[in-house]
Amino acid sequence: MRQTFMANESNIERKWYVIDAEGQTLGRLSSEVASILRGKNKVTYTPHVDTGDYVIVINASKIEFTGNKETDKVYYRHSNHPGGIKSITAGELRRTNPERLIENSIKGMLPSTRLGEKQGKKLFVYGGAEHPHAAQQPENYELRG
């Protein structure tokens, strides 16, 4: 009798990947990173278990936008007080806080559940080319597109 393989915490191998965001389009990079964080690039993917790998994104400040998104795309947040809405364009956010731009994009593609939160904690984004995770011996990951 054959049994379907179901991954659990004891039989998951996690790797560390470094992805260079220089010259990459924001959405294409984000969708691929979200897929790696969820573990969908593995044959052992199981929907209810966190089978994903750790991802380090470097050069976040050199991400690219297509079209007029740099000036036309606006991010809003609200403080829940009357008149407390704040807005910032994508280009301005890239100049001031490029890490938050990529984190918000990727975490928006993960599930809004406890499992999605757990998967989102395996993402590390840095604006420059340096990162403090050399001890984990991360592998370079080439994007498909």
Curated annotation (Swiss-Prot):
Gene3D superfamilies named among the record's database cross-references: Ribosomal protein L13
One Gene Ontology MF term: mRNA binding
InterPro entries: Ribosomal_uL13, Ribosomal_uL13_bac-type, Ribosomal_uL13_CS, Ribosomal_uL13_sf
GO biological process: negative regulation of translation; translation
Keyword Ribosomal protein: yes
Gene Ontology CC entries for this record: cytosolic large ribosomal subunit; ribosome
Annotated coiled-coil segments of the chain: none
SUPFAM superfamilies: Ribosomal protein L13
Keyword list, A-Z: Ribonucleoprotein, Ribosomal protein
PANTHER family assigned: LARGE RIBOSOMAL SUBUNIT PROTEIN UL13M, RIBOSOMAL PROTEIN L13
Assembly mode: Part of the 50S ribosomal subunit.
Function (record text): This protein is one of the early assembly proteins of the 50S ribosomal subunit, although it is not seen to bind rRNA by itself. It is important during the early stages of 50S assembly.
Family membership: Belongs to the universal ribosomal protein uL13 family.
Listed name of the protein: Large ribosomal subunit protein uL13
Organism: Staphylococcus aureus (strain NCTC 8325 / PS 47)
Gene: rplM
